[in-house]
């Protein structure tokens, strides 16, 4: 098992102007990035980064700083697999030559970190690629972009970092993985940390959602306590329906349900969301204890209601649910489970049995101090309208849906 250094050491090194190595989840990019604070950029640091990485150096910034510096997205609708928010590339307007040397790029990096810098201080395009970090950092998105901004902020510096992926010295056609990164860090006296450890550290020291209200809600599936939350960073409101004693230390049956107006409210047969919500409430009721967490802002797998309706139009023309999103220039799945994980932790849940057919949901909740002891499958709710949709989720999105091949489009299976 790889040995990681403490977050405290990494923060101290960042504050001192050193680089650190940061590893993300093996089910995500499974890569290690060299990271240092942008305001501490020197020709020597940049040259070191260029030597051992892919050389595609980026500078993560807060959304506020991106707006202040006039840094729009590189492309209007982000299609990156992991949602990396690239902006237009830039160079410093003054103090550089061609912009590509280590010294020139260091100048541009320091300028991007300067609180007094203005949009006119930069030229576009250039040789440095700023990235727009999500508000809330690694607690909202467990990526290197957010890790860099968080580390700089935690070190008491301007929230701007410099990142690049470390290349394997054993196989230069691929990226270095965790064990090799440990050796690399030791050889160069660098701290090696994981984003999962950063999340745990921030969760221990910071709070990103607030509990607003709670009330008894009698339903057709029994009485629940509705606990309302609001996200600090985007003001989106979420509701956890709680049944029974969930703080007794035993595994809790949990369903994290994505908002679906068409399925949950209108009873649309194009998806299985409404039946899944009903089934989750019924299963928690039968269990006598558990949580159904209703996540707002997840409409259409995170693309929003209007875009979902547009995707439906494309599906009526023959696209499947994945290609319809992609044809609109949108991700196949844009949902973020970080806020949901924080809510579950606030409710006192540490160990749970997760109600889902979607393995990606488990990955989205891992790293937040939550232990998932079992994935409990949801009942299959297929019909003539959603059978193709369900098969696409199985074949192209990895959902664990059994028995679909025994059905045809003219059948309805409950």
Swiss-Prot record:
Gene3D superfamilies per the UniProt record, alphabetical? DHBP synthase, GTP cyclohydrolase II
InterPro entries from the UniProt entry: DHBP_synth_RibB-like_a/b_dom (IPR017945), DHBP_synthase_RibB (IPR000422), GTP_cyclohydro_II (IPR032677), RibA (IPR000926), RibA-like_sf (IPR036144), Riboflavin_synth_RibBA (IPR016299)
**Known catalytic reactions:** D-ribulose 5-phosphate = (2S)-2-hydroxy-3-oxobutyl phosphate + formate + H(+); GTP + 4 H2O = 2,5-diamino-6-hydroxy-4-(5-phosphoribosylamino)-pyrimidine + formate + 2 phosphate + 3 H(+)
What pathway does the UniProt record associate with this protein? Cofactor biosynthesis; riboflavin biosynthesis; 2-hydroxy-3-oxobutyl phosphate from D-ribulose 5-phosphate: step 1/1; Cofactor biosynthesis; riboflavin biosynthesis; 5-amino-6-(D-ribitylamino)uracil from GTP: step 1/4
Named cofactor requirement(s): Mg(2+); Mn(2+); Zn(2+)
For binding GTP, which residues are annotated in this chain's numbering? 255-259, 276, 299-301, 321, 356, 361
Question: Which GO BP terms, alphabetically?
Answer: riboflavin biosynthetic process
For this UniProt record, give its keywords in alphabetical order, as a comma-separated list: GTP-binding, Hydrolase, Lyase, Magnesium, Manganese, Metal-binding, Multifunctional enzyme, Nucleotide-binding, Riboflavin biosynthesis, Zinc
Chain sites annotated for binding Mg(2+) 2: 29, 144
Q: Where is this region: GTP cyclohydrolase II?
A: 205-414
Q: Where is this region: DHBP synthase?
A: 1-204
SUPFAM superfamilies, per the entry = RibA-like, YrdC/RibB
Molecular function terms in GO for this entry? 3,4-dihydroxy-2-butanone-4-phosphate synthase activity; GTP binding; GTP cyclohydrolase II activity; magnesium ion binding; manganese ion binding; zinc ion binding
- Matching Pfam families: DHBP_synthase (PF00926), GTP_cyclohydro2 (PF00925)
Quote the record's binding site residues for Zn(2+).
Answer: 260, 271, 273
Co-factor note (free text): Binds 2 divalent metal cations per subunit. Magnesium or manganese. Binds 1 zinc ion per subunit.
Q: What PANTHER family does the database record attribute to this sequence?
A: 3,4-DIHYDROXY-2-BUTANONE 4-PHOSPHATE SYNTHASE, GTP CYCLOHYDROLASE II-RELATED
According to its UniProt entry, what is the function of this protein?
A: Catalyzes the conversion of D-ribulose 5-phosphate to formate and 3,4-dihydroxy-2-butanone 4-phosphate.
- Which named protein is this? Riboflavin biosynthesis protein RibBA
């Amino acid at each position: 098992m790889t040995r990681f250094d403490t977050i405290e050491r990494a923060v101290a090194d960042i504050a001192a102007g050193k680089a650190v190595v940061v590893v993300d989840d093996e089910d995500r990019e499974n890569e290690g990035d060299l990271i240092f604070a942008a305001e501490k950029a020197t020709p020597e640091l940049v040259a070191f980064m260029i030597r051992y990485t892919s050389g595609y150096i980026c500078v993560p910034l807060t959304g506020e700083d991106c707006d202040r510096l006039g840094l729009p997205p590189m492309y209007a609708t982000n299609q990156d697999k992991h949602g990396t928010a690239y902006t237009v590339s830039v160079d410093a307007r003054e103090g550089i030559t061609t912009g590509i040397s280590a010294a020139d790029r260091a100048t541009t990096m320091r300028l991007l970190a300067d609180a007094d810098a203005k949009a006119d201080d930069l030229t576009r395009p250039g040789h440095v690629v700023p990235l727009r970090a999500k508000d809330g950092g690694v607690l909202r998105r467990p990526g290197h972009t957010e890790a860099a901004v968080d580390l700089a902020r935690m070190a008491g510096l301007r929230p701007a970092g410099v990142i690049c992926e470390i290349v394997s010295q054993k196989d230069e056609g691929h990226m270095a993985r965790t064990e090799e990164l440990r050796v690399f860090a030791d050889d160069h006296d660098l701290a090696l940390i994981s984003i999962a450890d950063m999340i745990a550290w921030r969760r221990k020291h910071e709070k990103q959602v607030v509990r607003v209200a709670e009330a008894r809600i009698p339903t057709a599936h029994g009485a629940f306590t509705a606990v309302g939350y609001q996200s600090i960073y985007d003001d989106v409101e979420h509701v956890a329906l709680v049944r029974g004693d969930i703080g007794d230390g035993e595994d809790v049956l949990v369903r994290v349900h994505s908002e679906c107006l068409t399925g949950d409210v209108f009873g649309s047969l194009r998806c299985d969301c409404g039946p899944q919500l009903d089934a989750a409430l019924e299963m928690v009721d039968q269990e006598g204890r558990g949580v159904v967490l209703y996540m707002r802002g997840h409409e259409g797998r995170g693309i929003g209601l209007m875009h979902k309706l547009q995707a439906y139009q494309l599906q009526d023309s023959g696209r499947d649910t994945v290609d319809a999103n992609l044809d609109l220039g949108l991700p196949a799945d844009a949902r973020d489970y970080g806020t949901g994980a924080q809510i579950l932790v606030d409710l006192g849940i540490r160990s749970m049995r997760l109600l889902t057919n979607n393995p990606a949901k488990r990955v989205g909740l891992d790293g937040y101090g939550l232990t998932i002891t079992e994935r409990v499958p949801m009942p299959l709710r297929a019909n003539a309208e959603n059978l193709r949709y369900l098969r696409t989720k199985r074949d192209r999105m990895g959902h664990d849906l059994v028995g679909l091949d025994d059905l045809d489009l003219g059948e309805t299976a409950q």
